[in-house]
């Protein structure tokens, strides 16, 4: 897997003019964190980028997995706004593959703009709304079971990495997963199930309710013309948030929301 820290350093050196000229100092520290516009909250360790508390919890999870013969590894952790915007715009333009639920590449010409947007959002977060911006979320796999290139698909999770995910299921059911749970465990008709996507609940629950359509609009008013087909996004924004951004509270035990992490 690519080194995301190196990626972001390269991207920063060649940062688009819309980021250079966006006046990021006008945003609060919390807003910059939530939208992936700052890396001040991020610590890099062994190519993994998370907040320090989440990194320390991850160390515990990895060590626990090793006791069960699993080599839990991280495919992706922190993701900057810039990177998410680059990915999203390339998909909007049809320059990067968009897949269906059966991992088949879709033909852009066969879809209306609205249908194409929905197909993208099934697997890729709207920039500024990705949980990977927060330094609390990561994608995992079992390095010892990897054969060939990593795809991060549901079928892969049910075959190559089945042992890892069964183990995670058991640890989460006992609340012994060091605070990590799955926000996209089931298909609710929006984001595709992502069994590999783990979120550190003690911190993630602090940020998820701060995201709202009006805040997104305020930030993008400052950033300027950074996303293709912005008018389409703006027109459907409330529905996008309802279907593809909001995650029901039941994704983690309630006590993590009160700051109690027994």
What are these regions (language model features)?
Residues 2-261:
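Cell-envelope/glycan interface and biosynthesis
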């Amino acid at each position: 897997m690519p080194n995301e820290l190196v990626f972001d350093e390269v991207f920063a050196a060649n940062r688009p003019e819309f980021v250079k000229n966006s006046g990021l100092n006008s945003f609060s520290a919390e807003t910059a964190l939530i939208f992936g516009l700052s890396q001040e909250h991020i610590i890099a360790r062994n190519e993994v980028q998370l907040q320090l508390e989440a990194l320390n919890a991850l160390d515990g999870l990895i060590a626990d997995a090793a006791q069960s013969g699993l080599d839990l590894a991280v495919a992706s952790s922190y993701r900057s706004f810039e990177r998410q915007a680059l990915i999203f715009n390339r998909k909007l333009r049809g320059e990067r593959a968009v897949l269906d639920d059966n991992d088949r590449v879709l033909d852009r010409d066969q879809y209306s703009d609205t249908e194409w947007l929905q197909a993208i959002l099934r697997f890729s977060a709207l920039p500024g709304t990705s949980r990977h911006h927060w330094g609390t979320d990561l994608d995992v796999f079992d390095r010892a079971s990897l054969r060939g290139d990593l795809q991060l698909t549901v079928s892969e999770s049910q075959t190559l990495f089945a042992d890892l995910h069964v183990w995670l299921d058991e640890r989460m059911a006992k609340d012994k997963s060091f605070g990590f749970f799955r926000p996209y465990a089931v298909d609710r008709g929006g984001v595709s199930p992502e069994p590999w996507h783990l979120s550190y609940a003690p911190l993630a629950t602090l940020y998820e309710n701060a995201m709202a359509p009006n805040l997104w609009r305020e930030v993008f008013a400052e950033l300027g013309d950074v996303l293709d087909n912005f008018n389409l996004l703006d027109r459907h924004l409330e529905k996008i948030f309802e279907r593809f951004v909001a995650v029901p509270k039941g994704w983690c035990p309630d006590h993590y929301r009160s700051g109690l992490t027994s």
